[in-house]
């Protein structure tokens, strides 16, 4: 068998973490919250079938053709209009899922050795996506009592390390399941804005 030469950066990637989580979720009697897999009973199968049939009946050729790399223009317009703040459709990028979005963020914001800040604990799929670009990761831990981030830790670390961005999950955080209260989100946004720290 041919011994293929892979890029050096792949040596830092841990492809087994997500694979092992998803493998465990297929075992009988296991209800796994780790992989973020929704219950199959919750899928709106009938609604998807109806939408698919309508599109294939009314716009079959457009539906099967490639779209722009930014995503389907009418959908980007709809997303822009649906957001609670003013945004142009030109600033909306559609991806095939969160993993593609995380990979693109890593691709455009991380150089080898650049620093990123992450909420701890954090979503292993994001850490895996970012690791391909070989950043130096530092943690902003949740307070064990309140479950909230310590903004003073974020400020101190940003002033010391100058991270490219701060990654966290504000809704249904994986793995904790916690959602940040609205008033804390406002404090976090103000803190990051003052630090010039983009939030992912």
Spans of model-derived segments:
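Residue-level marker for buried hydrophobic side chains located in beta-strands
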Residues: 198-200
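A composition-driven signal for long, intrinsically disordered, charge-rich low-complexity tracts
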Residues: 6-7, 19, 114, 193
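N-terminal small-domain helix-loop-helix segment of the aminotransferase-like
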Residues: 11-97, 104
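Conserved core of the PLP fold type I
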Residues: 62-196
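Generic N-terminal amphipathic, Lys/Arg-enriched alpha-helix
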Residues: 1-9
